[in-house]
Amino acid sequence: MNKQVYMDYSATTYTKPEVLEEMLPFFTENFGNPSSLYSFSDKTKKAVNLARERVSKALNAEKNEIFFTSGGSEADNWAIKGIAYANKKKGNHIITTKIEHHAILHTAQFLEKEGFKVTYLPVDEEGFVSVEDIKNAITDETILVSVMFANNEIGTIEPIKEIGELCKEKNIYFHTDAVQAIGHVDIDVKDMNIDLLSMSAHKFYGPKGVGALYIKNGVKIQNLIHGGGQERGKRASTENTAGIVGLGKAIELAMENMPEENEKLSNLRGRLIRGIEARIPEVKLNGPKDMSRRLPNNVNFSFIGIEGETLLLDLDMNGIFGSTGSACASASLDPSHVLLSIGLPHETAHGSLRLSLGAKNTEEDIDYVLEVLPKIIKQRREMSPLWEDYMKNKEEK
């Protein structure tokens, strides 16, 4: 059996043993409904409150501003639809970017069919949105700006504080999808003037199927899910106690480990980028060149003359697991909307590989990838008419 190297931590992470350990009693012993009044539910009630406290501490938010959801997609949907419907008397215009996660883009497209107007702002070749562009897009009808904290494909960390200041000045709600940022970037919702923020536990070593939405006190938002009075009447459904406990523990660990973890990941990322650039000709690093403005675990390359899907299968056969884009879209054969938005031609975007690093990756893993990947690229290019055409054109120039 080949060595196995998982490098798709931006798609999902494993649940850390300490997190699982804290969750387990809530499946078997402490199974009471947290909304019940009797004492049997006291432990579950306390556990949910502790998780809320841990999340609020991580964001510098108030405890009553944290609402648990089934994940990042629900949190994004709630933020966008909830603000749109609750504030439509004030205006019907939303501003976002072309490189958002599909949970934002598809929600925005849904709202367009409902009569809302949406501006999808372009980004530069490194994936940054311009604060000036946001300013120029604002109209009297604008009720919400939604910009992701960090991009899941190319690792770009957006100028969130500046956008928050602009939105505060213009009296417009500001939402950020921070699903990729938790555990990698310092987040302070007060200092950054963030009104709404989405997160998902499985991106920071917590369980799948649980997330949270931070909603600043005073924000006018409509419910997405109707039913019982859970989450202070804002989000119906019996609380997923074990999941919520896991999210709380995972975010606490993520905050504690962040400085050390980021340094480790940055070093591994540097080794991987330098190694690929030194060993493989005609490659393009996608995303920010200034590594301080990029997620410490993100590497995204385009290889001229290569099909991304074929590359993934070749790597898989060698025990290396990466991605050609976000996992939510990798079943589709269309090139990544993010890579097209940063100006890559169709065929270059098609030949992209994202390697996202995480807690279990080592220098040995990096060296193994650097041993295997160049051989695969060389072999595939020898069979590729795209590569042949590219080299011919290059020689003619």
UniProtKB/Swiss-Prot annotation:
GO terms for cellular component: L-cysteine desulfurase complex. It comes from Clostridium botulinum (strain Hall / ATCC 3502 / NCTC 13319 / Type A). Pyridoxal 5'-phosphate binds at residues 72-73, 152, 180, 200-202, 238. Pathway: Cofactor biosynthesis; iron-sulfur cluster biosynthesis. GO terms for biological process: [2Fe-2S] cluster assembly; amino acid metabolic process. HAMAP family: Cys_desulf_IscS (MF_00331). This is Cysteine desulfurase IscS. PROSITE patterns: AA_TRANSFER_CLASS_5 (PS00595). The active site is at 328 (cysteine persulfide intermediate). Gene3D superfamilies: 1.10.260.50, Aspartate Aminotransferase, domain 1, Type I PLP-dependent aspartate aminotransferase-like (Major domain). [2Fe-2S] cluster binds at residue 328. It catalyses: (sulfur carrier)-H + L-cysteine = (sulfur carrier)-SH + L-alanine. Its EC number is 2.8.1.7. It is an enzyme of class 2 (transferase).
